[in-house]
């Protein structure tokens, strides 16, 4: 191993005039070495670097294109959603207005129905009162008639004696006989 190290050290001491070798002077060799390395890198790496940059550029452009398409789709969906929202808001407003109208209509219908029911109940009450009045009047008439009839019968019974009774019967028989002759 010592031989290998000695050979590298001996290479470092070679004279630089007219021969190829390593220059160990860092300040003198850096710009030259750097320019050689850069030249080799530029010459050989230019194609690779160009391909890498082109690939990267294509990926970025594809990403931007996809993003633009997604953005366009999102804007389109947003507009559709806004249109649906406006439509739903209009329908909700219509339902609200119709709901209030229907509530007012139902309220009026209920009031009218209640009024009609009260009117019918009032008519029924009046009919019932009239019926009860007629019934009471008829009962009073019947009682008055019965009392008058009983009074008349009582008066007739008290006034009639046998003689008057026989004369009344004879008069009635005579009237029937006369009526029979007229009809024959």
From Swiss-Prot:
Lipid bilayer topology: Single-pass membrane protein
InterPro entries recorded: ATP_synth_b/b'su_bac/chlpt
Role description: F(1)F(0) ATP synthase produces ATP from ADP in the presence of a proton or sodium gradient. F-type ATPases consist of two structural domains, F(1) containing the extramembraneous catalytic core and F(0) containing the membrane proton channel, linked together by a central stalk and a peripheral stalk. During catalysis, ATP synthesis in the catalytic domain of F(1) is coupled via a rotary mechanism of the central stalk subunits to proton translocation.
HAMAP family registered for this protein in UniProt: ATP_synth_b_bprime (MF_01398)
Xref: CDD domains: ATP-synt_Fo_b
Similarity section: Belongs to the ATPase B chain family.
Example GO molecular function: proton-transporting ATP synthase activity, rotational mechanism
Any further remark recorded for this protein: In plastids the F-type ATPase is also known as CF(1)CF(0).
Sequence intervals crossing the membrane: 27-49
Keywords for this protein: ATP synthesis, CF(0), Chloroplast, Hydrogen ion transport, Ion transport, Membrane, Plastid, Thylakoid, Transmembrane, Transmembrane helix, Transport
Self-association state and partner proteins as the record states: F-type ATPases have 2 components, F(1) - the catalytic core - and F(0) - the membrane proton channel. F(1) has five subunits: alpha(3), beta(3), gamma(1), delta(1), epsilon(1). F(0) has four main subunits: a(1), b(1), b'(1) and c(10-14). The alpha and beta chains form an alternating ring which encloses part of the gamma chain. F(1) is attached to F(0) by a central stalk formed by the gamma and epsilon chains, while a peripheral stalk is formed by the delta, b and b' chains.
GO cellular component: chloroplast thylakoid membrane; proton-transporting ATP synthase complex
Designated name of the protein: ATP synthase subunit b, chloroplastic
Compartments where located: Plastid, Chloroplast thylakoid membrane
């Amino acid at each position: 191993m010592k031989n290998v190290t000695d050979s590298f050290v001996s290479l470092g001491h070679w004279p630089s005039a007219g021969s190829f070798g390593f220059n160990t002077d860092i300040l003198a060799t850096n710009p030259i070495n750097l320019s050689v390395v850069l030249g080799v890198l530029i010459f050989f790496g230019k194609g690779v670097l160009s391909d890498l940059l082109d690939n990267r550029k294509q990926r970025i452009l594809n990403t931007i294109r996809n993003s633009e398409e997604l953005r366009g789709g999102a804007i389109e969906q947003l507009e559709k959603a806004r249109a649906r929202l406006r439509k739903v808001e209009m329908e909700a407003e219509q339902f609200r207005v119709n709901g209030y109208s229907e509530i007012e209509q139902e309220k009026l219908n209920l009031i009218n129905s209640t009024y009609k029911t009260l009117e019918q109940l009032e008519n029924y009450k009046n009919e019932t009162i009239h019926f009860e009045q007629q019934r009471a009047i008829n009962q009073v008439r019947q009682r008055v008639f019965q009392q008058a009839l009983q009074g008349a019968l009582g008066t007739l019974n008290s006034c009639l004696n046998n003689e008057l009774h026989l004369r009344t019967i004879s008069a009635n028989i005579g009237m029937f006989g006369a009526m029979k002759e007229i009809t024959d």
